[in-house]
C-alpha cells in the first residue's frame, strides 16, 4: 500500500477493515430514560472543565436504547450528562457513557471524543415501570425507574431541549504518552423526529465502583424524569476550544 493509498483510506483502524463506517449516523426509534437529579455542587464543579460553566448543581442520568442505528447496530448505553453553558448558551457536557457495543465505543471516542467504556446497560419495560440498569462486570452500579407513560409532555418543548448543543472533552495521547489532542468538542443532534415524550414518578440509585464512578456525583434529590422516543441523526463535531493552544499548555 503506497502513501497515497494510505492517506486516501485513513479514516479509522484497522485501515483495511475499520471498526465503524463513515456517516451520516442515523438512529431510528432511539429511546431515552433521562432522570435529572440534584447533586453536590463542589463535586460537580470538580469534574466540569473550563471554559464550560455550571448553574444549578444538576445531572441528567441517561439510559438510551438504540435498536436501529446506521453502522453501529443495536445497542444500549447509560451515563451522566451535566447541564452547562458555553459563552452564555445552554447545553450538556457528557461526563461518561457506558455501552455494550464496540463500533460506537471506537467511533465515539475517535471521531467526537465521547468518553465511552464497555459495560452492560439495559432499558426495558417491566409491567407498569420503565427500568434502566447498568452493570459494570458483575456489579450493579445504576438503577433508574419511572412510572410508564403517566403523563404526556409537550413535544415541541422536548424537541427544543434535544436540539441544544452538546459538549465533549476529547483527549487522545501521542505515542510517547503526552497529549496529542486535548479539545472541547461541540456537536448537535439533527433532523429530530420526536415521536413521543412522557413523564412519571421516578427513582434513581447509584452505587460506588472504582472504575465506573457514577456515584461520585451523589443523588440528593430527583427533580425530573423523561421518557422520549425519537428518530435523529448524530451530527459530527466541531472544536470550540483547544487546550493545547492555551498559554498554560506551554508552561507544563
UniProtKB/Swiss-Prot annotation:
Signal peptide: none annotated. Its EC number is 4.1.1.4. Coiled coil: none annotated. It comes from the Bacteria. Disulfide bonds: none annotated. InterPro entries: Acetoacetate_decarboxylase (IPR010451), Acetoacetate_decarboxylase_bac (IPR023653), ADC_dom_sf (IPR023375). The active site is at residue 116. Keywords: Decarboxylase, Lyase, Schiff base. SUPFAM superfamilies: Acetoacetate decarboxylase-like. Pfam families: ADC. GO terms for molecular function: acetoacetate decarboxylase activity. It catalyses: acetoacetate + H(+) = acetone + CO2. NCBIfam families: PRK02265.1. Catalyzes the conversion of acetoacetate to acetone and carbon dioxide. Belongs to the ADC family. This is Acetoacetate decarboxylase. It comes from Paraburkholderia xenovorans (strain LB400). The gene is adc.
Amino acid at each position: 500500500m503506497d502513501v497515497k493509498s494510505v492517506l486516501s483510506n485513513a479514516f479509522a483502524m484497522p485501515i483495511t477493515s475499520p471498526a465503524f463506517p463513515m456517516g451520516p449516523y442515523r438512529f431510528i426509534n432511539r429511546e431515552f430514560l433521562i432522570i435529572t437529579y440534584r447533586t453536590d455542587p463542589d463535586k460537580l464543579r470538580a469534574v466540569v472543565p473550563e471554559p464550560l460553566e455550571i448553574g444549578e448543581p444538576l445531572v441528567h442520568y441517561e439510559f438510551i436504547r438504540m435498536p436501529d442505528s446506521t453502522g453501529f447496530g443495536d445497542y444500549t448505553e447509560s451515563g451522566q450528562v451535566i447541564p452547562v453553558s458555553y459563552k452564555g448558551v445552554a447545553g450538556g457536557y457528557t461526563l461518561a457513557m457506558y455501552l455494550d457495543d464496540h463500533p460506537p465505543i471506537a467511533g465515539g471516542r475517535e471521531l467526537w471524543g465521547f468518553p465511552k467504556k464497555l459495560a452492560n446497560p439495559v432499558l426495558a419495560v417491566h409491567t407498569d415501570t420503565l427500568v434502566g440498569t447498568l452493570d459494570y462486570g458483575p456489579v450493579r452500579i445504576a438503577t433508574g425507574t419511572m412510572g410508564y407513560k403517566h403523563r404526556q409532555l409537550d413535544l415541541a418543548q422536548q424537541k427544543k431541549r434535544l436540539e441544544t448543543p452538546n459538549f465533549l472533552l476529547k483527549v487522545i495521547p501521542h505515542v510517547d504518552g503526552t497529549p496529542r489532542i486535548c479539545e472541547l468538542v461541540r456537536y448537535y443532534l439533527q433532523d429530530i423526529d420526536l415521536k413521543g415524550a412522557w413523564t412519571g414518578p421516578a427513582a434513581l440509585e447509584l452505587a460506588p465502583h472504582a472504575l465506573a464512578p457514577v456515584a461520585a456525583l451523589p443523588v440528593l434529590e430527583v427533580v425530573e424524569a423523561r421518557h422520549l422516543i425519537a428518530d435523529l441523526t448524530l451530527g459530527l463535531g466541531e472544536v470550540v476550544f483547544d487546550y493545547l493552544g492555551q498559554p498554560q499548555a506551554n508552561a507544563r
